[in-house]
């Protein structure tokens, strides 16, 4: 799996992820880019789960963003509807974390669209570790969203064998 973390603080939102691709217990690649900018660089998205599945979902999500003129909430809900009802999409195993300057969501294969309550998302095998670290840093430091995301990923990578220290970080300042 992997670890993807999204942190929102002040006028900044960040999605960051590690670069490890595993097949069973074997590391296949260490520098994968699991975080991307979409819709004219106005939306951030990261994935955890099957790589091929995630690319399919990125394409579908970007298409929904285009159709709904960058409206993140509407695009997320419409992708989740498709994911839940389309026979091919239902077989895809991945989670998406998406964010823009106004909102952040987790989109699941069950058709759920979840908005976090503390401006924090963490998904993937190292997600619980990253979430705990980021939550503590949000509550007890003045670090930026980017610094918190980096530190949370580093902590997750120290604990989770399916997460490495090769990070991709994308941010939007607004």
Curated annotation (Swiss-Prot):
It is found in: Cytoplasm. Na(+) binds at residues 157, 160, 163. One of its GO terms (biological process) is proteolysis involved in protein catabolic process. The keyword Nucleus does not apply. It is an enzyme of class 3 (hydrolase). It holds the Pfam family Proteasome. Keywords: Allosteric enzyme, Cytoplasm, Hydrolase, Metal-binding, Protease, Sodium, Threonine protease. A double ring-shaped homohexamer of HslV is capped on each side by a ring-shaped HslU homohexamer. The assembly of the HslU/HslV complex is dependent on binding of ATP. This is ATP-dependent protease subunit HslV. It comes from Pseudoalteromonas atlantica (strain T6c / ATCC BAA-1087).
